Amino acid sequence: MAYAPNVKNILVFPAGTEIALEIHDALKFSKFVKLFGATSVPCHAEFVYERCAENVPYVDDPALIDSLNALIDEWQIDYVYPAHDSALLRLTQERDRLHAAVVTSAEETVEICRSKNRTYEYLAGAPYLPQSYPDAAAVPSYPVFIKPSVGQGAVGARRIDDREHLDEALADGVEYAICEYLPGDEFTVDCFTDRHGKLLFAGPRSRARIRAGISVRSERFEADGGIMTIAEDINRRFDFNGAWFFQLKKNAAGEYRLMEIAPRIAGTMCVSRNLGVNMPLLTLYNMWGYDVSIINNGNAELLDRAFINRFRTDISYSTVYVDFDDTVTVRGRVNAILMMFLYQARGAGKEIVLLTKHADDIEESLDKYAVSPRLFNEVIHIRQGEDKTVYIKPDSIFIDDSFAERRAVHDNCGIPVFDLDMVESLLDWRA
């Protein structure tokens, strides 16, 4: 595919974080963007980024900038999109050394927000701050809540019930933010600030279930006046460019208290994106000097995440043979996952052959299910009792729900065979 002259090359680093995966999901279909990824270790990025470099130095390595510049020059990168708090800080502070622009907010904003203690100091006097304490001696009562001042997710965050355990926790050499314990609900507010500093969107979502600091069950709800007041005040005090978010929790009296602020994409901003607010893309529009507006469908929305399987296989083939009954169609419906693969295979230049013993007129049945016969390079309609193996050429794969058919093809043709549940291993998610 030829890219238009105005397409921008975007390098996401590090490309394997949940933040990076959300950036990828948000930008992969944009006609204005060509995505690239870079990681320090082998990770999930290689399964979703079509162009991905590994073994880039870690974010705290002095060699990082030179390594990224080599990729920027090789790939003609226009923008680097940081996808981790530490990467955001490092690349913002050293953006003058990079050969591409960094998608970021003002340096002072990034630096303050990287530390919870600095954030609380900067916002001193704001009514939505939790009660915080400089050290254990200043704590008047328990429980309290501690969290690394510089950190992300829920790593190291915990409730402390007495002085003994607080002293023990503080002895590990980590700088903590020590705050009042907040027993109420916790949630995140996704925000977008346009290039003129105007807050265009503030969308709260719950953090009902957390895994590794990422909200894996989240439900959006309407922002009330209290949330909007906090969002507007934070936006006024900081210099944000595009997407940012803050986390709130309620105290025992049901009042909102600020947990943290981050001037970056959040891994669960997909909740806002699927309302129509594509934060990663809107932030790029800011970078490009565009004036933007927001379309928000405003519908109820519940997200629940689980692990997804993505595979890399050494199977090579030029032709796909596929059955119809209980394969292309299952329980009276088209098999959407299989169709996804078939269209992907066709786009990759593979031949697709429908090989079926269908009892009825196959063209009428294809038409009934709105499956175009043009999807297939050939339709082979054989009688019941005929042997499918005689129609199969080498350098092929075979997809059929019937174990007996798969066994015959595997043993007689020596090619890989797939039941429906195995098709997921053939999908290529890279973009």
Could you say what each language-model-derived stretch is?
Residues 295-383:
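Alpha-helical substrate-recognition element adjacent to the catalytic core
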Residues 15, 323-325, 398-402:
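Acidic di-acidic motifs
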Residues 109-184, 194-198, 225:
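Active-site nucleotide/adenylate-binding loops and adjacent lid/helix of ATP-dependent enzymes
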Residues 386-404, 409:
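Conserved Lys-Pro-Asp/Glu-containing loop-to-beta segment of HAD-superfamily phosphomonoesterases
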Residues 1-104, 419-421:
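ATP-binding N-terminal substructure of ATP-dependent carboxylate-amine bond-forming enzymes
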Residues 179-239, 250, 262-288:
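ATP-dependent carboxylate/phosphate-activation module, predominantly the ATP-grasp catalytic core
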Residues 241, 264-322:
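Non-catalytic pre-domain segments flanking phosphatase-related domains
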Residues 241-253:
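A short glycine-rich, hydrophobically flanked beta-strand micro-motif that places a catalytic Asp/Glu
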